[in-house]
């Protein structure tokens, strides 16, 4: 069964809600409560979870720590992922200082082509030249945060693929051409702002999208 992309996004939301509930000392929850907090229906919660198995007990609900653990497993957060940043300009540097990667993601490399940046200390490491990617990626780094200019994005992606990267979080406003076995997630701020402008001008569409 194919899992809709929107369902994965909602699972992430459910997980964050469960983490909040656990922090508040809540031991049990229900699809109704999760749905209310996630702004979706209880039916949608149950449907999203059903893609991956049977969770909870009818009339009893879900045990918060158990469902949290199951969602972390589904989303691949029960392990440590090695990250690198390629492109140490303003955005890359800001991401290097970001404290919220959590326990499942660890920055293990920083890369650029600018000789003035290479060798500069950053977050307990140093910026290295992208030519070293083939030596640094295998066995250590699975995911790259790509923060280079648009015109350099495809070449950087090619270098990452050749080095053995498994996934790319792409901040460049360009569609990358990569092998199907390499996962790509695009972060496009302008596209997000454009969706917001459309949603503001079309409130009925926004209400339908929110269920």
Curated annotation (Swiss-Prot):
Superkingdom in the source lineage: Bacteria
Molecular function in Gene Ontology: DNA binding; DNA-binding transcription factor activity; identical protein binding
Main subcellular location of this protein, as a coarse class: cytoplasm
Keyword Transmembrane appears in the UniProt entry: no
Gene3D superfamilies (alphabetical): NAD(P)-binding Rossmann-like Domain, Winged helix-like DNA-binding domain superfamily/Winged helix DNA-binding domain
GO annotation terms (biological process): negative regulation of DNA-templated transcription; response to redox state
Compartments (UniProt record): Cytoplasm
Keywords tagged on the record: Cytoplasm, DNA-binding, NAD, Repressor, Transcription, Transcription regulation
Pfam (any one): Put_DNA-bind_N
Annotated InterPro entries: CoA-bd, NAD(P)-bd_dom_sf, Rex_DNA-bd_C_dom, Tscrpt_rep_Rex, WH-like_DNA-bd_sf, WH_DNA-bd_sf
Binding site for NAD(+): 87-92
Annotated DNA-binding residue span(s): 13-52
GO cellular component: cytoplasm
Assembly mode: Homodimer.
Known function: Modulates transcription in response to changes in cellular NADH/NAD(+) redox state.
Family: Belongs to the transcriptional regulatory Rex family.
UniProt protein name: Redox-sensing transcriptional repressor Rex
């Amino acid at each position: 069964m194919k899992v809709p992309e929107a369902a994965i996004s909602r699972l992430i939301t459910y997980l964050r809600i469960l983490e909040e509930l656990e922090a508040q000392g809540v031991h049990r929850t229900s699809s109704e409560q999760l749905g209310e907090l996630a702004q979706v229906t209880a039916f949608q919660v149950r449907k999203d979870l059903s893609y991956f198995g049977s969770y909870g007990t009818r009339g009893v609900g879900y045990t918060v720590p158990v469902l949290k653990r199951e969602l972390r497993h589904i989303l691949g957060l029960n392990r440590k992922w090695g990250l690198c940043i390629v492109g140490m300009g303003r955005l890359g540097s800001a991401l290097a200082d970001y404290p919220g990667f959590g326990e499942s993601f660890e920055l293990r490399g920083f890369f650029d082509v600018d000789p003035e940046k290479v060798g500069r200390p950053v977050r307990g490491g140093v910026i290295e030249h992208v030519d070293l990617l083939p030596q640094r990626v295998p066995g250590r780094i699975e995911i790259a945060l790509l923060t280079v200019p648009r015109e350099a994005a495809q070449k950087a992606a090619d270098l990452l693929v050749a080095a053995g990267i498994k996934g790319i979080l792409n901040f460049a406003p360009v569609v990358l051409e990569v092998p199907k076995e390499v996962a790509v997630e695009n972060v496009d701020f302008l596209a997000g702002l454009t969706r917001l402008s459309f949603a503001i001008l079309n409130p009925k569409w926004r209400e339908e999208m929110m269920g």
